[in-house]
Regions:
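Active-site phosphate-binding/coordination module
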Residues: 3-105
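Conserved acidic, metal-coordinating active-site core of Asp-based
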Residues: 74, 78, 85-187
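Charged helix-capping and loop-helix junction motifs
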Residues: 2, 64, 177-181
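Residues at alpha-helix caps and immediate loop-helix transition turns in enzyme cores, especially N-
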Residues: 2-3, 150
Length: 187
């Protein structure tokens, strides 16, 4: 509540509020999106700069469809759950969402994932069929040693940037998709 009041004070002072998150734009709480001073957001680790008032992306730095398929093929060698973020929403499949306990996710995180994922029969088939680009690919790992092996394998691809917001995940973005670069572009 104190943070929200501070944001309201920024708004009164004419300061632009720019939420920056690893989530898609839909993951920004409505109470923040609806602040009059929040006109733009930086989402999916900087892959998207979104115009919140007109509900559209104004800058993107995404992963090509071919690169998404490459990432998914690499990740499937490990006990992982992959969620590409496509058009502002996370895509998952039953094999991932039905086995979240295996990835050490708390009940609260499991609820958040269920509430924010679109379940399709097969992530790979969805990616191939749509031909879509992705803002990022989130990968949950069951084995932390495998996570480090996978991180190194993905870091060897120069077009990628790898980060993590949890002890058991990897977030794969296109090189150049980061919150700092997105904020500088917006400025």
């Amino acid at each position: 509540q104190g943070n929200y009041q501070a944001l309201k004070e920024c708004e009164k002072a004419g300061i632009q509020i720019v939420p920056a998150t690893g989530r898609g734009v839909g993951g920004i709480p409505p109470m923040i999106r609806e602040l009059p001073g929040a006109n733009y957001a930086i989402t999916t680790n900087g892959a998207v700069v979104a115009d919140l008032k007109n509900n559209k992306a104004i800058k993107t730095c995404g992963l090509s469809n071919e690169m998404i398929q490459r990432i998914l093929n690499i990740a499937k060698k490990y006990h992982s759950a992959t969620d590409p973020f496509i058009d502002g929403r996370a895509i998952t499949e039953p094999a991932s969402i039905d086995h979240m306990d295996e990835f050490g996710l708390s009940p609260e995180m499991q609820k958040l994932i269920r509430d924010t994922r679109e379940v399709v029969p097969s992530v790979m088939e969805y990616v191939k069929t749509t031909g879509a680009e992705a803002e990022k690919v989130n990968i949950f790992m069951a084995d932390l040693e495998e996570r480090e092996v996978l991180r190194k394998e993905l870091m060897a691809i120069p077009e990628l940037s790898i980060s993590s917001s949890m002890y058991n995940n990897l977030e794969v973005n296109a090189k150049g998709a980061d919150k700092g670069s997105a904020l500088l572009w917006l400025a």
